[in-house]
From Swiss-Prot:
Interacts with creB. This is Probable quinate permease. SUPFAM superfamilies: MFS general substrate transporter. Residues 44-74, 119-130, 181-193, 307-325, 374-387, 478-542 are extracellular. One of its GO terms (molecular function) is carbohydrate:proton symporter activity. The gene is qutD. One of its GO terms (cellular component) is plasma membrane. Keywords: Cell membrane, Membrane, Quinate metabolism, Transmembrane, Transmembrane helix, Transport, Ubl conjugation. The chain crosses the membrane at residues 23-43, 75-95, 98-118, 131-151, 160-180, 194-214, 286-306, 326-346, 353-373, 388-408, 457-477. Ubiquitinated. Deubiquitinated by creB, probably to control its activity or amount. It is a multi-pass membrane protein. Residues 1-22, 96-97, 152-159, 215-285, 347-352, 409-456 are cytoplasmic.
């Protein structure tokens, strides 16, 4: 088998790979467009002279400016931290669809509040709006990956959850370029900096409109006892009748997983909290999920996202427009590489190998950039044009982006969406998303101070964390590509970790062959023509 071949846990009818599943993933991923845009535009907006003049940055000390900038950026992450947890009861009781509508509504209210800010009113409305927007994206970062993973066929689950990451990068691309556009085309004014804030309403509006038409997650419906609705939605998504053998297998696996949960963790609202504190298997996976986001943020990527002018200045780029243009190129590179990751790598090369390769390559590039800054000290020796060493440093910076983006950028979100059983999934994803926003908050809050105090040492610091992540992934993180959600317990119990995927996949294929043999022995047609009453229960074929 080719290393880039799709991995199927069982023969999958071509009808399963239909446009509906991609459409649902795309609509849900407007949440990540909100996140990506908000993460990208704020740093360069704070660098606009019109914004700095209106809010009196010119009268503040450098320390005060760094503090205010860090507060504006980081209150968004603080809101997102709590939003990730608030989404748990909504997703549990009301479902994934209503959770997405909640996220879009709160974000829209926050974006609208920010539009009321000006020099006379001060920064209060910006702070309040950023916190509300953070609550919205925190909720969305919890619910969206779960929603997509619960609908996705195992063989393309990484690709579909990857659409969430693609939305993040597209939003980021717009956010990186919009300030360059307004700075080049508009004179410094209130209008110049308020336009980037207003654009936030576009992805949230699209989410609110699209989410109305989304199908509820079949697995959530099963967990709530709404079996008829669950089978109907699953048939619509898979484009197969309820009595097709593929559907019988999938529904049977969900039933079995729910029964196992009922006898172990339990299906109530509070049961997952008890499991999170007492069940060693659950605690271990929560630890893995949180640490994946620790290493992701330890790559330094969010320091670049939020403070790109500061980052590029440390390499030797001078001038606001030059930094904004370089930031825009950074966004283009991330988006292009994300397409490659989405279409060819995540479900073919897998999660584990991508993380290992990405960490090694990113670490080398960060070390080279840090060494250049240490030797050349471009901040203390500015030149009109970049030197050859500076150009090489920029090359390795963009090469770092190429290594990081198809590995650590989206893969932790994919893995956290698929590691847990159904009733644990909402709380576990809440913990994982909150963990991401916690590390994100710390990076965004202290990056200006780190660059002021550590200078080139910041690059070595992030490189060291990337090297340590290699050890973590190799010994503790199993490969999950192609493994059904209902078989994750077996995967994480298999040892050694680096062979677990092959072991479990072989067992799944053996069980599937036996299941089909038993079905055929009982007189069931391979084409699914015979009615299977305990599954379809008088549902019409779709």
């Amino acid at each position: 088998m080719s290393i880039l071949a799709l991995v199927e846990d069982r023969p999958t009818p071509k009808e399963v790979y239909n446009w509906k599943i991609y459409l649902l993933a795309a609509v849900a991923s407007f949440t990540s467009c909100m996140i990506g845009y908000d993460s990208a535009f704020i740093g360069t907006t704070l660098a606009l002279s019109s914004f700095r003049e209106e809010f009196g940055f010119s009268t503040m000390s450098k320390t005060a400016v760094n503090l205010v900038s860090a507060n504006i950026v980081s209150c968004y992450q603080a809101g997102a931290f709590f939003g990730a947890f608030f989404a748990y009861p909504i997703g549990h009781f009301w479902g994934r669809k209503w959770g997405l509508l909640f996220a879009g509504t709160i974000f829209t209210l926050g974006a609208g509040l920010m539009l009321g800010a000006n020099g006379d009113r001060g920064l209060g409305l910006l702070y309040g709006g950023r916190v509300l927007a953070g609550l919205g994206v925190g909720a969305g970062s919890n619910i969206t990956p779960i929603y997509i993973s619960e609908m996705a066929p195992p063989s393309i689950r990484g690709r579909l959850v990857g659409v969430y990451e693609l939305g993040w990068q597209i939003g980021g691309l717009v956010g990186f370029w919009i300030n360059y556009g307004v700075s080049e085309t508009l004179a410094p004014s209130h209008k110049q900096w308020i336009i980037p804030f207003a654009v936030q309403l576009i992805p949230s509006g699209l989410l609110l409109i699209g989410a109305v038409f989304l199908k509820e997650s079949p697995r959530w419906l099963f967990s709530r006892g709404r079996r008829e609705d669950a089978i109907k939605n699953l048939c619509w998504i898979r484009q197969l009748p309820a009595d097709h053998i593929y559907m019988i297998e999938e529904i049977g696996a969900v039933d079995q997983a729910l029964e196992e949960q009922r006898t172990t963790i339990g299906l109530g609202f509070w049961k997952p909290f008890k499991a999170a504190g007492t069940n060693k298997k659950v605690m271990y996976r929560l630890f893995l999920g949180s640490m994946l986001f620790f290493w992701q943020n330890g790559s330094g990527i969010n320091a670049i996202n939020y403070y790109s002018p500061t980052v590029f200045k440390s390499i030797g780029l001078h001038g606001a427009n030059t930094s904004m243009f370089s930031t825009g190129i950074f966004g283009v590179v991330k988006t292009v590489v994300t397409f490659v990751w989405l279409l060819y790598l995540i479900d073919r090369l897998g999660r584990r190998l991508l993380l290992l390769i990405g960490a090694a390559g990113a670490a080398v590039c960060l070390l080279i950039v840090g060494a250049y800054i240490k030797i050349a000290d471009p901040a203390s020796n500015p030149t009109q044009e970049m030197t050859g060493g500076g150009i090489a440093a920029m090359f390795f910076f963009y090469l770092y982006t190429v290594f990081y983006t198809p590995s650590w950028n989206g893969t932790p979100w994919v893995m956290n969406s698929e590691m847990f059983e159904p009733n644990m999934r909402s709380l576990a994803q809440a913990c994982a998303a909150a963990s991401n926003w916690l590390w994100n908050f710390l990076i965004s809050r202290f990056t200006p101070q780190m660059f002021a105090k550590m200078e080139y040492g910041v690059w070595f610091f992030f490189a060291s964390l990337m090297l340590l992540s290699i050890v973590f992934v190799f010994f503790l993180v199993p490969e999950t590509k192609g493994i059904p959600l209902e078989s994750m317990d077996v995967l994480f119990e298999s040892k050694p970790i680096w062979r677990a995927h092959a072991t479990v996949l072989a067992k799944l294929r053996e069980d599937e062959e036996q299941f089909r043999h038993d079905i055929e022995e009982s007189g069931y047609s391979k084409t699914g023509e015979q009615q299977v009453e305990h599954v379809s229960e008088d549902l019409p074929k779709v």
